[in-house]
Amino acid sequence: RDAQESRGLGDVYKRQPYEMAEYLARDLTMLQEINPDTISLSPFVPREGTSFRHQLPCNLETFLRLTAILRVMFPKANIAASPLVNSIHVQGQVMAIYSGANVLRVPLFPPPVPGVTRRSGGVSLLRRLQSLYASLSSHNYEMVVDRGDSLRFLERHPKAPAQKN
């Protein structure tokens, strides 16, 4: 393991089919043991063609509550809000920021859609980024594009490259 490696945890999907409260409690206990620098949180959203296509999606309130719980448990970790939360609510990622997430994952390229050129897809992505920026700025949040080291990582590695602001 590299001495400057950040400890991250892959996607934590919430409100999975058949999930029970004790599973969530076990997951949170495991997270405390791992004590990750980064937690990527994604809601469960059913998809056609899968065995769970008829299951209910994650409730937005549940997702936001879990985001807030993770922020209290891990005040110095990066908590990433997946763009998938926008399929539950159009402002899902922004609401996740208000609930404690501090990283927005934004796809670099929009998904391929028949009849949409890469240029018009890029314009759509630019509009989405501008909308995110405006929404966050209106609530005194600053959106930056940088390396994204967590506060825990920077405390352990004070000579790590400084973040750009």
Question: Residue locations for each model-derived region?
Answer:
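Auxiliary Fe-S-binding modules of radical SAM enzymes
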Residues: 32-165
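Active-site glycine- and acidic-residue-rich loops that bind
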Residues: 14-28, 83-90
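Extended alpha-helical regions
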Residues: 7, 25-32, 45
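Active-site-proximal beta-alpha loop/turn segments in soluble metabolic enzymes
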Residues: 10-19, 47-53
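Residues within alpha-helical segments
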Residues: 1-4, 28, 97
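Single conserved hydrophobic/aromatic residue that forms the stacking wall/gate
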Residues: 1-9, 13
